[in-house]
Amino acid sequence: MNLASSLGIENPPKPLVDFKDLIQERAGAEGGAFIYNPKVDDIVDKYGVIGPDGVRMLVMGTVDKGGSGCMCPGSAFLRALLRHLMLNEKSAVILDMEAGIEHLGRGTTRGMDLMIIVVEPGARSLETAERIKKLSSEIGIKHIAAVINKGGAGKVNARLEELGIPILGEIPFDQQLMQADLEKRAPIEAGGEAVNAIVKIKEKLMETVEEIRKENEASKK
């Protein structure tokens, strides 16, 4: 669980999809009728693990088998939880999705205020970023931005600008970050150029989120 160790969480939470009895109780059994909108408002407090900086982590897991996804009790449970988190939670919610576009095809990320694409310095990564922008628009995600990973901004930066994808910043390749990962330490403990860049990206991200918040409030008037 790389994300857990990055957050300084030594014992990551068990994936929610592994709680078969809970899913059956809330959403129904496999192969039969199931509840499309099960009760999920207590899941964060009961199954989330809090990191040293106050971040609460939940691991969803996956229930998709072949094709574009299944509609089953486990899937209904996870979708209901995501809707609850994005519509009812007062805190910021960050979804760390698998690399690629599969979650966009399943509509898992529908309703997000901002999609952040991590772009590697290569042609395939840029092609994926272009597809993500298109698919995000199709499911109603109005705002996307990119973070360039491992340096090599030059042509990557220019191509992202051509695509109309704002850039939050660039994380340079940093041996200190790699060493921290090998030692299962949170990146922030490593210091160095990469961490300094991440701090700047965080500041720009907060500014972007605030602008989106104001835009959303204005649209409701």
Task: Label the predicted regions.
Residues 197-212:
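C-terminal alpha-helix
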Residues 66-67, 178-181:
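A short acidic, helix-capping loop that chelates divalent metal ions and anchors anionic groups
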